[in-house]
C-alpha cells in the first residue's frame, strides 16, 4: 500500500468532525434543536468533502506529487459516508423515521429530490470505485465518474434552495466549485504550472550559469 501514513491521516481527519458533532449532540451542546444542526452540519460537510476530492487532481498537476491522487478515492468514499450520515440524521430527526411523511416532505421541500439525486450519483461512484469495476467497465468507467461534476451542481443547488436567504457561505462553495471545474477544461488545465518542474528548471538554469 502506497502512502500508508497519509491514508491513516486522512482517515483520522475525516473522523474528527462526525465524532465531535455526535459527541456535542450527546452532551446537549448543539442548542435547542440538535437534530437540525446535525442534518445541516453533515450536509455542508458532504459538499466540502466533495470539493476537497475534486481538488486532488489540480493539486497533483500543480505539485507533481502522486499522494494527492492516492487519497482521492478515499476522500470520495468519505464524501459518500458523510452524505449517508446527512440522510440518516434527516430520517431520524426530521422525519422521525415516519416514512409516511416523506411524500409530504417531497412536495413541501422539493430540494430533497435534488439531494436524493446527488446521493444516488455518489452511490454509483462509491460502488464502482474499485479496480474490478475499472477493469469491467473499461473506458466507460471514466465517463461514469464524470458525473461527479453533475453531483457537484446538484449539491450546490440543494444547498442554494435551503439557504437562499443568506448566500454568503453558499457563494464561497460555489466559487470554489466553479474554479475547480474551470481547471478541468483542457485549455486551462494545460496552464497549471508545475511547482516541482519550475524548481527543477531554476536548478538547471543555476547549474548552467555556474
From Swiss-Prot:
* Family as reported in the entry's similarity comment: Belongs to the MsrQ family.
- Membrane topology per the record? Multi-pass membrane protein
Transmembrane spans: 8-28, 37-57, 75-95, 110-130, 147-167, 169-189
Is the keyword Electron transport in the record?
yes
User: Per UniProt, which keywords does this protein have?
Assistant: Cell inner membrane, Cell membrane, Electron transport, Flavoprotein, FMN, Heme, Iron, Membrane, Metal-binding, Transmembrane, Transmembrane helix, Transport
Cofactor (UniProt): FMN; heme b
- Protein name per Swiss-Prot or TrEMBL: Protein-methionine-sulfoxide reductase heme-binding subunit MsrQ
Q: Does the keyword Disulfide bond apply?
A: no
**Organism whose genome encodes this protein:** Pseudomonas syringae pv. syringae (strain B728a)
Primary role: Part of the MsrPQ system that repairs oxidized periplasmic proteins containing methionine sulfoxide residues (Met-O), using respiratory chain electrons. Thus protects these proteins from oxidative-stress damage caused by reactive species of oxygen and chlorine generated by the host defense mechanisms. MsrPQ is essential for the maintenance of envelope integrity under bleach stress, rescuing a wide series of structurally unrelated periplasmic proteins from methionine oxidation.
Amino acid at each position: 500500500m502506497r502512502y500508508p501514513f497519509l491514508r491513516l491521516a486522512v482517515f483520522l481527519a475525516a473522523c474528527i468532525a462526525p465524532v465531535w458533532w455526535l459527541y456535542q449532540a450527546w452532551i446537549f451542546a448543539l442548542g435547542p434543536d440538535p437534530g437540525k444542526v446535525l442534518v445541516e452540519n453533515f450536509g455542508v460537510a458532504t459538499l466540502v468533502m466533495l470539493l476537497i476530492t475534486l481538488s486532488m487532481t489540480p493539486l497533483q498537476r500543480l505539485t507533481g506529487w502522486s499522494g494527492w491522487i492516492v487519497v482521492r478515492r478515499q476522500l470520495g468514499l468519505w464524501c459518500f459516508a458523510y452524505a449517508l450520515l446527512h440522510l440518516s440524521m434527516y430520517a431520524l430527526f426530521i422525519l422521525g423515521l415516519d416514512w409516511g411523511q416523506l411524500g409530504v416532505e417531497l412536495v413541501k421541500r422539493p430540494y430533497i429530490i435534488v439531494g436524493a439525486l446527488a446521493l444516488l450519483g455518489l452511490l454509483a461512484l462509491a460502488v464502482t470505485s474499485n479496480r474490478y469495476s475499472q477493469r469491467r467497465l473499461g473506458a466507460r468507467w471514466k465517463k461514469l465518474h464524470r458525473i461527479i461534476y453533475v453531483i457537484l451542481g446538484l449539491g450546490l443547488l440543494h444547498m442554494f434552495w435551503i439557504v437562499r436567504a443568506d448566500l454568503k457561505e453558499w457563494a464561497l462553495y460555489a466559487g470554489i466549485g466553479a474554479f475547480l471545474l474551470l481547471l478541468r477544461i483542457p485549455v486551462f488545465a494545460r496552464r497549471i504550472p508545475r511547482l516541482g518542474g519550475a524548481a527543477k528548471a531554476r536548478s538547471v538554469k543555476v547549474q548552467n550559469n555556474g
